[in-house]
A protein has these predicted regions:
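Conserved beta-propeller blade signature
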Residues: 46-49, 90-93, 134-137
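Bacterial N-terminal signal peptides
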Residues: 7-15
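Loop/turn residues immediately N-terminal
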Residues: 53-56, 96-100, 141-144
Length: 164
């Protein structure tokens, strides 16, 4: 009977000392699917692959892969499209909600002008096109010109019957 007490005592202390997790308290990790990507672009030495839920960053200089998601800086999930601007070494991410993130020199900046606008109707961003220092967003209401240097909306062209 005495050996059972000692065994239980040592077993209990052993279980308290064993780590159950690979990450510390107060940190987060994601469990997003990284098997399906719908777009890939190149920005300098980096390749970015977009899935509907997250972004993978591949550094071509050291073969390092970084997962980018809401856990480490992106504003949302639900990526609709991405565009590279090689003249300014930046990447623009468009979400299904019409929110935008700009990645430049490892810094993620949110541009929420379209998302917060009071435009009635479809604000979805369907495609992005990069030229010079601007990225043009094709939306449900028209074309939006995004200035990469200033990290803001430069102009909006509303297309349609009344605003043609």
């Amino acid at each position: 009977m005495r050996w059972v007490k000692y065994t239980l005592f040592f077993l209990n202390n052993f279980l308290l000392l064993v780590n159950a997790q690979d990450f510390s308290v107060g940190t987060w990790r994601d469990h997003l699917p990284y098997s399906e990507f719908n777009q890939i672009v190149e920005v300098g030495n980096f390749f970015y692959a977009a899935s509907p839920y997250s972004l993978l960053e591949f550094d071509n200089s050291n073969n390092e892969i970084t997962k980018l998601s809401t856990v480490n800086g992106l504003s949302e999930i639900g990526i609709s499209c991405i565009a590279a601007n090689n003249s300014h070494q930046s990447l623009l991410i468009a979400y299904n909600s019409s929110n935008l993130d700009l990645i430049k020199n490892g810094e993620i900046t949110n541009i929420s002008t379209i998302f917060n606008s009071s435009i009635i109707g479809d604000k979805s961003i369907y495609s992005l096109y990069s030229h010079s220092k601007y990225i043009y967003a094709c939306t449900g209401f028209g074309i939006v010109v995004i200035d990469i240097e200033r990290k803001e909306i430069k102009d909006t062209y509303i297309l349609g019957n009344n605003n043609s």
